[in-house]
Amino acid sequence: MKQSILFERVSARLKAQVGPDVYASWFARLKLHSVSKSVVRLSVPTTFLKSWINNRYLDLITGLFQAEDPEILKIEVLVRTATRHGTKALDEVVAPEPAAPTQMRRPTSAQPAGQAVQQAVSAVAAARPASFGSPLFGSPLDSRFTFDTFVEGSSNRVALAAAKTIAEAGQGAVRFNPLFIHSTVGLGKTHLLQAVANAAVQNPRSLRVVYLTAEYFMWRFATAIRDNDALTLKDSLRNIDLLIIDDMQFLQGKMIQHEFCHLLNMLLDSAKQVVVAADRAPWELESLDPRVRSRLQGGVAIEFDAPDYEMRLEILKRRLAVARLEDPSLEIPAELLQHVARNVTASGRELEGAFNQLVFRRSFEPNLSIERVDELLAHLVGSGEPRRVRIEDIQRIVARHYNVSRQELVSNRRTRVIVKPRQIAMYLSKTLTPRSFPEIGRRFGGRDHTTVLHAVRKIEELISGDTKLSHEVELLKRLINE
């Protein structure tokens, strides 16, 4: 069995075993490094992730590989650190020699789609690994994740503009500090954060930049405390200009959060820029220390929505253009790309999976039909299964419908223009999700369960006698379930 096929089969079984959310959190960045006789080597971007997988999932992964190939006896997990070198005291990201700027956005009336795709090819081909300071600190940057390769659209345009402003600002913070970007998995948060870091380190003002995942921050601080080296680490972090933290929802532990709170306060009070990303809004990060949550809410929170059809098609076109760099003979008809863009709607990550499936299948099924593509991608299209509804989705859609913000929905404001949408959102959260009254109350600014119960009963009573409101609620249900 080919190595790539083996890894693909094991990955699919692993995702089915642990569930899509756990898989996206811990295994999305797992890659096949090599297969040598009876040993399979996998790679991950951080030491923390390696330790986490070894301690919790190594036996499961070993069993899945052995189920596919009984000759496999051992699984090793490595850390991808090949592009990191140097011995500087401050473990900061160091700028590579700047390449010629390549501007690339979605096609406009003055820029044909073919030209935009060609620019995507140029941007990826020109990308080179970023250099790093010490190998002891900082999560690795992917040189492919730049502003040039980021697909802009209506769902991310505001966040992209804010990110570019920060990358170009130089020393000192911009007005919106911290910048908090949130969305469900697979919509491009990590790409955008790494684009900020990659651009900032090339800034002629020689910015001192640190990009970290929350899991790496936890591991690095725990290691420093264990080795009695915490003061050195703190001093290093105090001297940076830009701190970028990804996957904030994973920041755990009272001591670690206490240290992060001190760092956050120090940087913000010193007018240093902070950029944070998570899978939910800052006020929904219930596991965070309230002081950290409060500080994160003091800046600007921007949400990514799922990409629209035009964005999805552009992502597929660019992915095809890059794949042709490796295999110039690769051809995928435009109608197949358009069909995939119309039907795989959840996230860019699932779109990437659909594209990889197409490329893989065309190697031995060159005449793929649309019907065959539907069979292959049924697990991504949905297979008629009901969509899992989240409270944050309900809040977002209700807020948009009534022209208020999500933050207003969870605030203490009691004006009529806010109270009615809030009660409707609580009602829909109870009827469309399995969440309890207390949990819904926590998601709406820490309200008591009796407040949620009152809202549900109130909306039920109003619906029974108000046809217009009943139609509004049904419309919202359809929008939420789309």
Curated annotation (Swiss-Prot):
SUPFAM superfamilies: P-loop containing nucleoside triphosphate hydrolases (SSF52540), TrpR-like (SSF48295). Residues 71-139 are annotated as: Domain II. InterPro entries: AAA+_ATPase, Chromosome_initiator_DnaA, Chromosome_initiator_DnaA-like, Chromosome_initiator_DnaA_CS, DnaA_C, DnaA_dom, DnaA_N_dom, DnaA_N_sf. GO terms for biological process: DNA replication initiation; regulation of DNA replication. Keywords: ATP-binding, Cytoplasm, DNA replication, DNA-binding, Lipid-binding, Nucleotide-binding. One of its GO terms (molecular function) is lipid binding. It is found in: Cytoplasm. The keyword DNA-binding applies. The keyword Methyltransferase does not apply. Its main location: cytoplasm. GO terms for cellular component: cytoplasm; plasma membrane. Pfam families: Bac_DnaA, Bac_DnaA_C, DnaA_N. Residues 1-71 are annotated as: Domain I, interacts with DnaA modulators. ATP binds at residues 186, 188-190. Residues 140-362 are annotated as: Domain III, AAA+ region. Residues 363-482 are annotated as: Domain IV, binds dsDNA. Belongs to the DnaA family. Plays an essential role in the initiation and regulation of chromosomal replication. ATP-DnaA binds to the origin of replication (oriC) to initiate formation of the DNA replication initiation complex once per cell cycle. Binds the DnaA box (a 9 base pair repeat at the origin) and separates the double-stranded (ds)DNA. Forms a right-handed helical filament on oriC DNA; dsDNA binds to the exterior of the filament while single-stranded (ss)DNA is stabiized in the filament's interior. Domain I is involved in oligomerization and binding regulators, domain II is flexibile and of varying length in different bacteria, domain III forms the AAA+ region, while domain IV binds dsDNA. Oligomerizes as a right-handed, spiral filament on DNA at oriC. This is Chromosomal replication initiator protein DnaA. It comes from Rhizobium johnstonii (strain DSM 114642 / LMG 32736 / 3841) (Rhizobium leguminosarum bv. viciae). The gene is dnaA.
